[in-house]
Amino acid sequence: MDPNTVSSFQVDCFLWHVRKQVADQELGDAPFLDRLRRDQKSLRGRGSTLGLNIETATRVGKQIVERILKEESDEALKMTMASAPASRYLTDMTIEEMSRDWFMLMPKQKVSGPLCIRMDQAIMDKNIILKANFSVIFDRLETLILLRAFTEEGAIVGEISPLPSLPGHTNEDVKNAIGVLIGGLEWNDNTVRVSKTLQRFAW
């Protein structure tokens, strides 16, 4: 196994632990909490794939981070922060829309790269809009948090979400998955449109 893969996982586990402490002290906003929940699923999947214990990895990750911070000068930290591009978090959906449970009468599920597509094939002759929450960097979609398809009545009839066991996806992965979802919904004579935010950055 590549040692860099292991050390990356260990550091990610410790940084997630730090962010969890921030959330427990009620210092995180909605995008922060969204990423925290998503990354927890991702870490569990990676831990299972790598055969590594998360608690042990967190302790080792702490040692790695502490060693780096001890060697890092304040000036170097300032330069790193100044040169790093900042990503923006964009939200079409409210927290309620993101966290709401939904059920399918005729479920269909398909995996497209690192993304999972789910839709209800029982939905027919509806006007549907696709909404998503995601981060953007350099005016391109960076990370999809969650995409859902809503009817005019507000019912959820489809979804695209990252697979926890396959972290990381590209803008092209998201475009392909959206195409699959739209094609599946339009097959039943539904009219599908994409939110303005998605149109600008991901479609």
Curated annotation (Swiss-Prot):
Question: Where do we find the motif Nuclear export signal here?
Answer: 137-146
Does the keyword Oxidoreductase belong to this entry? no
Q: Does the keyword RNA-binding apply?
A: yes
Give the signal peptide as a residue range, or say none if absent: none
Biological process (GO) annotations?
symbiont-mediated suppression of host cytoplasmic pattern recognition receptor signaling pathway via inhibition of RIG-I activity; symbiont-mediated suppression of host gene expression; symbiont-mediated suppression of host mRNA processing; symbiont-mediated suppression of host PKR/eIFalpha signaling; symbiont-mediated suppression of host type I interferon-mediated signaling pathway
* Region feature (RNA-binding and homodimerization): 1-73
Q: Name one GO cellular component term.
A: host cell nucleus
Compartment(s) where it occurs, according to its Swiss-Prot or TrEMBL record: Host nucleus; Host cytoplasm
Q: Where is motif Nuclear localization signal found?
A: 34-38
Q: Which domain of life is it from?
A: Viruses
What are the protein's UniProt keywords? Eukaryotic host gene expression shutoff by virus, Host cytoplasm, Host gene expression shutoff by virus, Host mRNA suppression by virus, Host nucleus, Host-virus interaction, Inhibition of host innate immune response by virus, Inhibition of host interferon signaling pathway by virus, Inhibition of host PKR by virus, Inhibition of host pre-mRNA processing by virus, Inhibition of host RIG-I by virus, Inhibition of host RLR pathway by virus, Interferon antiviral system evasion, RNA-binding, Ubl conjugation, Viral immunoevasion
Kindly give the Pfam families that the UniProt entry links to this protein: Flu_NS1 (PF00600)
Which comment does the entry carry about domains?
The dsRNA-binding region is required for suppression of RNA silencing.
What this protein is reported to do is described as: Inhibits post-transcriptional processing of cellular pre-mRNA, by binding and inhibiting two cellular proteins that are required for the 3'-end processing of cellular pre-mRNAs: the 30 kDa cleavage and polyadenylation specificity factor/CPSF4 and the poly(A)-binding protein 2/PABPN1. In turn, unprocessed 3' end pre-mRNAs accumulate in the host nucleus and are no longer exported to the cytoplasm. Cellular protein synthesis is thereby shut off very early after virus infection.
Q: Which family does it belong to?
A: Belongs to the influenza A viruses NS1 family.
The name this protein goes by in its record: Non-structural protein 1
